[in-house]
UniProtKB/Swiss-Prot annotation:
Classification via SUPFAM superfamilies: Protein kinase-like (PK-like) (SSF56112)
Name the record gives this protein: Serine/threonine-protein kinase STE20
Composition bias, Basic and acidic residues: 587-598
Single GO biological process annotation from the record: response to pheromone
Binding site for ATP: I626, G627, Q628, G629, A630, S631, G632, G633, V634, K649
Length: 915
């Protein structure tokens, strides 16, 4: 109740009061007039009764702070207990649980909980006595001994909404006094939680009390009783008002009393409570009531246990449902892309020992097997890292086919530019006419590739005629020496040169229809061979394997191939592939498929435009199959009008992985008419096969001449002059050849020299076959390519210098080294050393040095080399090469005859792998 109301209540009872504030919104009415009926017999003043009725009418509201008073004298208590019993019975009918606390001479003083805003806090002060006289004497004795009672402590409820106990604490002296009181059958002060819980169970109701969400900063209620004065002095300090209340609900009992039910329904109404409701006399019924309270308390605890069990079972059910949901959802979830990556490898150099630290095991094995010593690794750490990265890039290459590279699309005619522009967006990986990643050298109008590309000229086995690439070779075929090491002097080994026509003069011509219409039977075998190589493990250490091959049914003559592989194991490169959802993956695959179909239609439409109409069988006759690739065969034929020999390559477009490159190559070659380039003649599209007709060079490749003959400086000069003329033309057109070597230099019987991109030739032997199928050897590569630097057309000049060494010594430098070590030596040694440099003239030495300058800026161009004295003064005429070409052909025929005799005597046990 309010302070004003309390002031009015003080004179009504005639008792001195001290105010004490409990930190609650309200307390229910206490039994302040339990024995007023007995006091009324002593003092029957009606006015006192009326005033007490007014006190009951002015009950406390729920939102008001609760005040309580204590009595310091037994005389004052006896004056306060004079209330009529009949009025107590009338008040009992109205009674609810709201009133102020009056600790008079009472058997029991209870402070019960009141519902307010869904919060609850239980607090009680219970004083019990056996009878009225004992209570009066006890209170007087307590007053004399100045016993001090502490105010009630409030404890917050637990998570289940039930307070463990709210205890009324009593000082140690009071506890000793209470023990004495119990022994003398005096007033029993029950301050423990059992009495409190018993009181709650007797009420059988769920009550809610609003408690502050924050504890008051400071609250002190001190009640001091005077020993003899009979007056009570209270010292109270201000406390901060609590903030918004927190709501906790206590479980209600199954049995509820009518009075508390009314109170719960009307929490804000005031009601009067008569002393009859609050008074518990010392009567024979008291033990029965205590037993009832005990049983009710047990019922309350059993209800609490049931609620706890029910809550725990609900929690288990919810947890199981959550786990089932998570397990069902986890089956459909996809793993996200990696995050928070770790730096696993960090390569460094030990400052004390100078050795590498942190190298992956694969790299260490690769370097150990490559022949690169630790000393070399320590001396050129960056070079080793560069060549290993370069080697891995080439090994992981997906098979981009080698075509004549262009580095200035602006120099091409509009037809080429327009046709190529349609396909530039189709495949960003191709190199021809690709503008991305090729910085421009403005002074020359050239583009220099910012990313070195591997030598991936996928040549046909016939070392002479192809401007169209075959499908990519296996990874282990990329860095393989194109010829074995020279034979020791005096040592003779059985020749294993492959023979297309053991005796060319006796070779029978197959009908045109038979060669064209019949699908090449070795194509399927070669396709399987290529696939098995691609899917095979990483390259092994150098090894030599020889195998005999059976004759091909479609070839006009038996052929044999010796597979001489020299490979190095490449460390795997860890790659992270992000996981794509199934639907997104399907959509992406469908889009890619649609794009492929669209590009295929565009390609066929464009090929139909540029290809000549008609059937090639009607224009060319006497087709002789001289080679077989994975995508088709190579034939020699005669033009029905001019009777000139031509080379025809038949390609199945469905087997070509890079169809756009074929179109690009045709368009480039149509614009590259030159006397030193194997020229494109015509093309046909018949029944899904593309027929490319090219100029035929019957003398074969320069490799045959280099292998079987020794060249003079004049003859070397003639080869260099004709090669430089072809390079000058290509460079003027903005084309990078990037694969200048003896395999791609073709000769006629008269000694004429022409460049070809893929090294087709009329006759192939074991070396030719190896050099054409195992392409991309590093031995002719320029240092800037190996070191992953930008490069331009001068890479062809370096390759020309290596080819000069090849003509002088019969093989390129480092041919006997492993591919990785060869890359390392190219990157670190710079200009290779000749075995016998003193045998060369000064003119040739200077010319060679100019070609092999490590710095591309110091290296000569094709035009500058054509003006060098070695070309202008020493180089001989082309006719000087004719005897060498004929001599090489004779030696090849002899080797073929030996091979034919060996094939007749030995059983054929291995399948034909001739390409």
């Amino acid at each position: 109740m309010s302070n004003a109301n309390q002031k009015e209540n003080v004179p009504s009872l005639g008792l001195p009061r001290t105010h004490g504030t409990l930190n609650v919104n309200a307390l229910k009415a206490t039994d302040i007039l339990k024995h007023k009926g007995k006091l009324n017999e002593v003092n029957s003043d009606q006015s006192t009764t009326n005033e007490n009725d007014e006190v009951q009418e002015e009950a406390v509201f729920l939102d008001d702070p609760v005040h309580f008073t204590r009595v310091s004298s037994s005389s004052e208590l006896s004056a306060a207990l004079s209330v009529n019993t009949t009025e107590q019975e009338q008040d009992e009918e109205k009674g609810t649980e709201h009133a102020e606390l009056e600790p008079a001479e009472e058997d029991t003083v209870e402070v019960d909980t009141i519902r307010n805003n869904g919060d609850k806090t239980y607090s009680t002060i219970r004083e019990s006595a056996s009878d009225f006289e004992t209570t009066n004497n006890t209170l007087i004795e307590i007053s004399k001994n100045s016993s001090t009672y502490s105010s009630t402590e409030f404890l917050n409820n637990n998570n289940n909404g039930i307070s463990n106990s709210n205890r009324a604490t009593i000082d140690s002296e009071s506890k000793l006094r209470m023990n004495k009181l119990r022994e003398g059958s005096s007033t029993s002060l029950s301050n423990d939680s059992n009495g409190f819980n018993g009181m709650i169970s007797s009420n059988q109701a769920s009550t809610v009390l609003s408690t502050p969400s924050q504890k008051p900063s400071s609250t002190t209620n001190t009640i001091t009783k005077a020993n003899n004065g009979g007056s009570t002095r209270a010292q109270k300090e201000k406390h901060t008002s609590p903030k918004l209340p927190s709501t906790v609900t206590a479980p209600s009992s199954h049995r509820k009393s009518a009075d508390l039910s009314k109170t719960n329904k009307l929490p804000s109404t005031t009601a009067k409570r008569t002393p009859k409701q609050a008074v518990t006399s010392s009567s024979p019924k008291e033990p029965a009531k205590r037993k009832s309270s005990t049983s009710k308390m047990k019922g309350m605890f059993s209800s609490l246990v049931q609620n706890m069990k029910r809550n725990s079972s609900d929690n288990r059910k919810s947890a199981s449902s959550l786990s089932s949901v998570s397990s069902s959802s986890s089956s459909t979830l996809k793993i996200s892309t990696p995050y928070n990556p770790k730096h696993i490898y960090h390569v460094g150099v030990d400052a004390r020992t100078g050795e590498y630290t942190g190298l992956p095991e694969e790299w260490e094995r690769l370097l150990a097997s490559s022949g690169i010593s630790r000393k070399e690794q320590q001396q050129n750490m960056q070079a080793v890292i560069d060549i290993v990265n370069f080697y891995q890039d080439v090994a992981d290459h997906t098979g981009e086919e080698k075509v004549i590279k262009t580095f200035d699309p602006k120099k091409q005619n509009p037809l080429v530019r327009d046709s190529l522009s349609k396909y530039e967006q189709v495949d960003d990986n191709r190199t021809s006419y690709a503008s991305g990643g090729t910085p421009t050298l403005e002074q020359n109008g050239f583009h220099t590739s910012s990313t070195p590309r591997s030598r991936t000229s996928l040549t046909s086995p016939t070392a002479g005629y192809s401007m169209i690439s075959t499908p990519p070779m296996a990874t282990q075929e990329k860095y393989i020496p194109t010829r074995p090491a020279p034979k020791p002097p005096g040592q003779q080994t059985p020749s294993s040169n492959a023979s297309l026509t053991p005796k060319m003069q006796n070779a029978t011509m197959s009908p045109i229809k038979e060669n064209i219409s019949s699908p090449v039977t070795k194509s399927e075998v070669d396709d399987e061979l290529l696939l098995s190589k691609k899917n095979a493990s990483l390259p092994k250490l150098p090894s030599d394997d020889s195998s005999s091959h059976k004759k091909s049914a479609t070839d006009s003559a038996p052929t044999s191939v010796e597979t001489d592989t020299e490979t190095v194991k490449v460390p795997p490169i860890p790659k992270t592939t992000p996981t794509v959802p199934a639907k997104a993956s399907r959509r992406s695959n469908e889009k890619k498929k649609e794009e492929r179909e669209r590009n295929k239609k565009l390609l066929y439409a464009k090929l139909t435009e540029i290809c000549s109409p008609g059937d090639p069988k009607s224009k060319y006759r006497d087709l002789i199959k001289i080679g077989q690739g994975a995508s088709g065969g190579v034939y020699i034929a005669h033009d029905t009008e001019s009777e000139d020999s031509v080379a025809i390559k038949q390609m199945n477009l469905e087997k070509q992985p890079k169809k756009e490159l074929i179109l690009n190559e045709i368009l480039v070659m149509r614009e590259s008419k030159h006397s030193n380039i194997v020229n494109f003649i015509d093309s046909y599209l018949a029944k899904g096969d593309l027929w490319i007709v090219m100029e035929y060079m019957e003398g074969g490749s320069l490799t045959d001449v280099v292998t079987h003959c020794l060249l003079s400086e004049g003859q070397i000069g003639a080869v260099c002059r004709e090669t430089l003329k072809g390079l000058q033309f290509l460079h003027s057109k903005g084309v990078l050849h990037r694969d200048i070597k003896s395999d791609n230099i073709l000769l006629s019987l008269k000694g004429n020299i022409k460049l070809t991109d893929f090294g087709f030739c009329a006759q192939i032997n074991e070396n030719n076959l190896k050099r054409t199928t195992m392409v991309g050897t590093p031995y002719w590569m320029a240092p800037e390519v190996v070191s992953r630097k930008e490069y331009g057309p001068k890479v062809d000049i370096w390759s020309l210098g290596i080819m000069i060494i090849e003509m002088i010594e019969g093989e390129p430098p480092y041919l006997n080294e492993t591919p990785l070590r060869a890359l390392y030596l190219i990157a670190t040694n710079g200009t290779p050393k000749l075995k016998e440099p003193e045998a060369l003239s000064d003119t040739l030495t200077k010319f060679l040095d100019w070609c092999l300058k490590v710095d591309p800026s110091e290296r000569a161009t094709a035009t500058e080399l054509l003006d060098d004295p070695f070309i202008t003064e020493i180089a001989e005429d082309n006719s000087s090469l004719s005897p060498l070409v004929k001599l090489a052909r004779i030696k090849k025929l002899e080797e073929q005859e030996e091979d034919a005799g060996t094939d007749e005597t030995e059983p054929e046990t291995t399948p034909d792998t001739t390409i």
